[in-house]
């Protein structure tokens, strides 16, 4: 069963579009550009939505790319996922990056990103002198390879 939480929305501009889900089971809702803009080839830009959110405490909204923009236009969200904290009250803006060799024109009302509501868990930090051992240890940055899943150094993981 789908969970729900309430987001209060303030329109900061008359052309702002209130978000909605496109299908009954959609996880993400679309964010729309509030005005025309241009992102030059191989450049980035900040695109406003003309909206401000009041998100319930204990939740965040994650801003993510739209797959169609990425596939068909080479345009994505630069800092993905972008986080909108529950205590932020300013305009929701999206940093888009144009990976293509052609300028990308954004028209008022275009869907520029999608957003997903997520519950927040805050960590409690404890400084220690030593960390527990693990199979992986300090190996990172591609050390697990790209082939054969479930193996470590050529041996199956138990």
From Swiss-Prot:
UniProt keyword list: Hydrolase, Magnesium, Metal-binding, Nucleotide metabolism
InterPro entries: dUTPase, dUTPase-like, dUTPase-like_sf, dUTPase_trimeric
Single GO molecular function: magnesium ion binding
Gene3D superfamilies: 2.70.40.10
The protein's Enzyme Commission number: 3.6.1.23
Family: Belongs to the dUTPase family.
Official protein name in the record: Deoxyuridine 5'-triphosphate nucleotidohydrolase
Taxonomic lineage: Bacteria, Pseudomonadati, Campylobacterota, Epsilonproteobacteria, Campylobacterales
Gene of this entry: dut
